Amino acid sequence: YQYPMATDSNLVYNHEKGNDNDGSAFTSFIESSPIDIQDGDQFVFLRRMIPDISFANSDANIDPNTKKAIFSLKAQRNPNEGFVKTSSNTVLSTTELNHLRLRGRSFGLRVESTDQGVNWRLGVPRVDIRADGDR
């Protein structure tokens, strides 16, 4: 069988088939742990990002220009503090570069989508990271 199957009460359920929750959209996401340079001794400045995402295997009836995901970069000053600044950018399959301005001791990346019928696969996003001083 191509997909996992389960039974209960004389019914057979076909799991993990399709891109939605039985016809309803659901939030899918992946999130990194905090990333720093030089063991967090130095602040970083994030200037731009090249997203690497594919929307292959999305439902066929979706316009290719509307398939999207939200890339959120979050910065924090200290490990025990929450993230204080966020830069969120909508990324389409045609997006080549996102400009942003974030600084902190560490940062994290979250990619999410809430659209119905959209399937995405994350590659290796590239972020322009520069060492920056504390202000």
Task: Annotate each PLM feature.
Residues 1-135:
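Beta-sheet repeat architectures centered on beta-propellers
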